[in-house]
Amino acid sequence: GKSTITQYFDKIGTYTNADDIVAATGMSNQEAAEFVDHKRYEAIENGEDFTFETVLSSQYKIEILKKAKESGYFIKCVFMLTVDPEVNVARVATRVASGGHDVEKSKIIERYYKAVANIPQLMELCDILHIYDNTITPVRIVRKHKDDISIFPNDLWPEAKIIELIGE
């Protein structure tokens, strides 16, 4: 999932993750989400670098990125997805079987489609954007560096599906 992949990327500035806050403090998910969002806006106000991990299924997270962009930030994003939300449902079930936290199936599916729907906005906001499919093993399907966009079709993601995904 996100946290597994996140460990392989450099974190610039302050790193915030609501799940980590819940685990460390016992805050509710909502309290932790509000806490980390406050930290992100605080970083923007202070011109500090920051990194965060999110499902990106809410417009509110896009608003954070918009605020950062308006404030002159260079935005680099790594977006992980799967070809189908049922893959995510199965992964959460595996996590629960190993003692991890559960998420309702309907919520997983809803978040999947909301997050995917945010990709065209990411294409606009991000200076650098890498989109990886993690259905089997992580495989890059989109690379955006400034105005240069490359797509990498494969068996799960044909060219037309990638073009639809990024809103081109």
Q: What is the role of each PLM region?
A:
Residues G26-Q30, E53-T54, K107-E110:
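Short, flexible loop segments at the rims of nucleotide/cofactor-binding pockets, characterized by
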Residues Y15-N17, I75-C77, L129-I131:
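Conserved beta-strand scaffold positions in the cores of enzyme catalytic domains, especially
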Residues Q121-E168:
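NTP-dependent small-molecule kinase module
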Residues T4-F50:
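Conserved substrate/cofactor phosphate-moiety recognition/catalytic segment
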Residues Y73-Q121:
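A glycine- and Lys/Arg-enriched "phosphate-lid" helix/loop adjacent to the NTP-binding pocket
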Residues F9-K11, S71, L125:
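Short, structured coil segments at secondary-structure junctions
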